[in-house]
Amino acid sequence: MPLTSLAHHCYTMACNNAWSNHRLLTACGKLSQADFVATRTSFFPTIKSTLNHILTVDWYYVDALERGLSGAEPNREVDRFFDPEEPFDTCTALAVEQRAVDRRLINACAALDDAKLALPIPVMRRAGVQTEAATRLLAHLFQHQIHHRGQVHAMLAGTSVKPPQLDEFFCANEAHLRAAELAELGLSEARIWTN
């Protein structure tokens, strides 16, 4: 089934994000705690810190997106998303929260249409409120997630846990490779591709 609109593409990207996070966090969940927190070569020095960064930034932008799409004022207390900088010490606890924010992003994207994609989304920054079109905010968020998941993937290569394949989401002939994980997430090929 083809992508039918930009809104549909954003929805599929949100589903891809949830699936990729699920697959990556499942692999990271096989690490010992020592490996999870071990210092490595990357932008953030540990798998733990990188995964926490993905999560806190997701909280920040998904909150801004939900508020902007509903017409609510921007959140003035955005520091709460980053204090503490690493809210979770274990992969298990982090995975639960990541799955919850991934579901929020899927739900927000499922409600998109062309008009909502054009909406200005106010984002609270330290310097004040900045506004981004929903399309640009989503593009940035998806890119941010991919960028840092790639760093975790590379760090996993230095452990005994094999880094998972993260590019088996969009091609129809690879549906069988993701079916079980989509079911675990409450998603299906039919729902994703006929939105």
List the predicted regions and their residue ranges.
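Extreme N-terminal tail/first-helix region
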Residues: P2-C15, I192-W193
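A short, mixed-charge helix-start or loop-turn motif at secondary-structure junctions
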Residues: L3-A7, D83-C91, A127, T131-T135
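Short, contiguous alpha-helical
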Residues: Y11-T26, K30-R80, M124-S188
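Helix-adjacent hinge/juxtasegments
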Residues: G71-L117
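Charged/polar, low-hydrophobicity segments characteristic of intrinsically disordered regions
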Residues: F81-A100, E174-N195
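A short coil-to-beta-strand element that immediately follows conserved catalytic motifs
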Residues: D113-P120, P163-Q165
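Long amphipathic alpha-helical segments
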Residues: D114-A118, G158, L185-W193
